[in-house]
Amino acid sequence: MSTIQRICLVLTIIGAINWGLIGFFQFDLVAAIFGGQGSALSRIIYGLVGIAGLINLGLLFKPNEERSREEAANPEMR
């Protein structure tokens, strides 16, 4: 996993935690920290989390490297 994918994964996790807080407690942590949902900084954070989610979408379609190595080493597993 590349560095950019790790950063995107962290941002996606932060976004998921924020959505959980909104769903369970009606508390938007990003808005509370950065000055409300309409502030420029909050919108930037929301945008970055959204882009990170799109980048992580590619992980769904990436083949498992460990499984590929096992299949290459042992062709009868297919």
UniProtKB/Swiss-Prot annotation:
Keywords linked to the UniProt accession: Cell membrane, Membrane, Transmembrane, Transmembrane helix
Single GO cellular component term: plasma membrane
Keyword Transmembrane helix: yes
InterPro entries referenced in this protein's UniProt entry, alphabetically: DUF378
Keyword Iron-sulfur part of the UniProt annotation: no
A Pfam family annotated for this UniProt entry: DUF378
Membrane topology label: Multi-pass membrane protein
Superkingdom of the source species: Bacteria
Cellular compartment(s): Cell membrane
Transmembrane segments: 7-27, 41-61
The protein's name: Uncharacterized membrane protein YuzA
Species for this entry: Bacillus subtilis (strain 168)
Lineage: Bacteria, Bacillati, Bacillota, Bacilli, Bacillales
